[in-house]
Design a protein with these regions (language model features):
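An anionic, glycine-rich sequence signature occurring as long contiguous blocks
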Residues: 4-22, 254-365, 451-465
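Basic, amphipathic alpha-helical segments enriched in Lys/Arg and hydrophobic/aromatic residues
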Residues: 75, 370-437, 445
């Protein structure tokens, strides 16, 4: 009988000593992150809400892992940069992931779920399950406020999710030049809090489709906050009469949308652009004479008399008339807001929506929301929700637990590298578990701060199992 040779890692000699490595360390983990994520999750009850939204059709006699454990395991893995479901095959025995899922870390009978289990989960959810999960995200957002806020900004944006196979409802999008999905993300623009998301086919959505989604979200928000001022904000893809009418049906809702130039609107900007061309040329000439830096652009803000025939009412149309060295850059915004000046509407209110794109980048680049490679459209929606849940945990960690620290504004990838990827030796006794972290850890004080805040934070997570 042949004997297996342990897999070794070889390194160049150091100080006359040979150096070898192996994977026989035993109860060691390279991920401290699940313990932090567990603390955040217990505080907000996210995976409890999401799992409760799924109709568990499994026979109780054959259930080894509860639905809440499955959802939490997948979300925690993504939040620790393990976006591939196959990673569960190795991580199911990881002591820290088991401890984060409230299982005994060194008990072989308490191993976590494997990749095939998650494949069955993703492909077993129904459209009704996913709808309830979308509502669970909205409920989590509402619960994140101790009292009804005076105002929230509901930022909406689409994001390209390129597809490379034969996924259901993956269509060619001329704007992006490839086959893709086009998920819709909703965030609260002032805080960065996630509201919900919907995976959409790759074609450009119609106004009635966006309005159908927003109507359900607004209904849930209004049930909790009857008089909160809500401002809908989006780029030119959302300046359609259906969303405008939706805002106008609610006395406490307004909108501010980008507006695409057309054969009627664009000529209205020309007098202002012509004036700014002369001003810009004069400013540049004066700067050159004085040996100063030549101004990059000259811009002014105006309100123009314009109303599209499809609009449900008369709204303010704001123009940014900008002249640059390479030409003109007229931009338009339409809004139902009466009081702010044209400059305030465009510069301070509308341009702030660019932060929404940063939130989407975090979900997409750091938390793999575009890992939608399953053939099933519903399974890919489930994968999107897993990444969104990972974002929620990171956002709460960053804004609540890490507030005032060096990582208060860090992206998820930075938090993962600095806080989550720490070597831990796990020792399990009869009545306790000890976690031994590196003696030379450079973030001891920060880890102490984080764990103490999570330890004393109230938990709304009900007992699972």
């Amino acid at each position: 009988m042949s004997e297996s040779t342990p897999e070794q890692l070889r390194f160049p000699p150091v100080a006359g000593l040979s150096v070898r490595g192996d994977f026989d360390g035993g109860a060691l983990s390279s991920d401290f992150g699940p313990m932090i994520l567990r603390g955040v999750d217990r505080q907000i009850g996210l995976t409890e809400r999401l799992s409760a939204a799924i109709d568990d059709r499994r026979h109780p006699s054959y259930v080894t892992h509860t639905m809440r454990e499955l959802v939490a395991q997948r979300v925690y893995q993504i939040a620790c940069a393990y976006e591939d479901g196959n990673d569960a095959n190795a991580l199911r025995r990881d002591a820290l992931f088991k401890l984060g899922l409230e299982r005994k870390p060194l008990d072989a009978a308490m191993d976590l779920a494997s990749a095939p289990t998650f494949s069955r989960l993703e492909n077993g959810v129904s459209a009704r399950d996913l709808y309830r999960m979308a509502r669970a995200f909205v409920e989590t957002f509402i619960a994140s406020y101790d009292a009804p806020p005076k105002v929230i900004v509901l930022d909406m944006d689409h994001c390209e999710d390129a597809t490379h196979g034969q996924q259901e409802l993956a269509f060619y999008n001329h704007h992006y030049g490839n086959y893709c999905y086009l998920p819709l993300f909703l965030f609260e623009g002032l805080s960065g809090k996630f509201i919900t998301a919907v995976l959409r086919p790759g074609k450009r959505p119609k106004g009635v489709e966006n309005a159908m989604i927003l109507k359900r979200v607004l209904k849930a928000l209004r049930a909790a906050w009857p008089t909160t001022r809500i401002v809908l904000r989006g780029d030119g893809h959302f300046s359609n009469p259906e969303l405008m009418a939706l805002a106008m049906d609610d006395p406490y809702t307004d909108f501010i949308f980008g507006l695409t130039g057309n054969r009627v609107l664009t000529p209205l900007a020309e007098p202002f652009l012509e004036h700014n061309r002369k001003v810009h040329a004069l400013r540049c000439e004066n700067a050159r004479r004085a040996g100063a830096t030549v101004p990059h652009s000259t811009r002014t803000y105006h309100e123009v008399d314009y109303r599209a025939g499809s609009w449900p009412g008369p709204f303010r149309t704001i123009l940014k008339a900008e002249v640059m060295e390479l030409g003109t850059n007229p931009r338009f915004v339409v809004t139902s807001l009466d009081l702010p000046s044209p400059e305030c509407v465009y510069r301070d209110l509308y341009c702030a929506r660019g932060q929404d794109e940063n939130f989407i980048k975090m979900i997409k680049n750091d938390l793999a929301s575009d890992r939608t490679s399953d053939h099933s459209f519903l399974a890919n929606q489930m994968r999107l929700f897993f990444s969104c849940a990972a974002y929620v945990l990171h956002q709460v960690l960053r804004s609540d637990i890490l507030a005032g620290t060096e990582l208060a504004n860090a992206q998820p990838s930075t938090v993962i590298i600095k806080l989550f990827k720490l070597a831990v030796r796990v020792v399990q006794y009869k009545d306790r578990v000890r976690l031994h972290l590196p003696s030379s850890c450079p973030l001891k004080a920060l880890l102490k701060h984080v764990t103490e805040k999570l330890f004393f934070a109230p938990s709304i997570l009900t007992a699972s199992g």
